[in-house]
Amino acid sequence: MNESETLLQFYTWSIFLMSYLIGSIPFGLLFTRLAKLGDVRAIGSGNIGATNVLRTGNKKVATLTLLCDILKGTVVVLVIKFLNDPIENSIIISLVGFFAFLGHLFPIWLKFKGGKGVATYLGVCLGYYWPAAIVFIIVWIMFFILTRYSSLSALIAVIITPIFVYFSYPHLYAHCILVMMSIFVIIKHHANIARLLIGKESKIGTQNRDK
């Protein structure tokens, strides 16, 4: 391996590490503490995501958490797309989003106990292929209106979005990584799925655990 190849590998893995660290920022925990709402991990489901932050009763903090969790997936992808050719470096750009997503799920700052990845998943889609983000949002809103289940809406959205990408976006790497992200989201929702199956999953606006 020559010097240029070594530098390229160092550059690539440095980007992945930086993406992971950005994804690891626990905005939900930080914002609830700054707003003196307590430790969000001790509220509701114990999740650090926007849905659980909403259970504090502070809609502004929940909205801010949602936006920041989305943006940390979007920004890293857009920055790398700006610095690299989107066609020649599609696998690197896809992996950058994946590492940011993994950071949210397994943040180093919280002993690798993070969120469920829905907002960051959406953010990665928005940065890499915005029509996928639009499909995700439409599906989520539609099923949320029908069911009032945030978790079920997210699960259906992460199943339908990769199918849409498969038929509309001709990049195998991007599709494979999106499928892996969907699998992670589904696994992270295993408790929600169990409650849905026995009819004990709570809907938005109730006091029981949701996400």
Swiss-Prot record:
GO annotations of cellular component type: plasma membrane
A GO BP entry: phospholipid biosynthetic process
Transmembrane segments: 10-30, 63-83, 90-110, 126-146, 152-172, 174-194
EC number from the UniProt entry: 2.3.1.275
Record's catalysed reaction(s): an acyl phosphate + sn-glycerol 3-phosphate = a 1-acyl-sn-glycero-3-phosphate + phosphate
Membrane topology, as annotated: Multi-pass membrane protein
Major location category of this protein: membrane
Subcellular location: Cell inner membrane
Superkingdom of the source species: Bacteria
One Gene Ontology MF term: acyl-phosphate glycerol-3-phosphate acyltransferase activity
EC class: transferase
Keywords, alphabetical: Cell inner membrane, Cell membrane, Lipid biosynthesis, Lipid metabolism, Membrane, Phospholipid biosynthesis, Phospholipid metabolism, Transferase, Transmembrane, Transmembrane helix
Pathway where this protein functions: Lipid metabolism; phospholipid metabolism
Subunit record text: Probably interacts with PlsX.
Described purpose of this protein according to its UniProt entry: Catalyzes the transfer of an acyl group from acyl-phosphate (acyl-PO(4)) to glycerol-3-phosphate (G3P) to form lysophosphatidic acid (LPA). This enzyme utilizes acyl-phosphate as fatty acyl donor, but not acyl-CoA or acyl-ACP.
Similarity-based family: Belongs to the PlsY family.
Name of the featured protein: Glycerol-3-phosphate acyltransferase
Organism: Bartonella quintana (strain Toulouse) (Rochalimaea quintana)
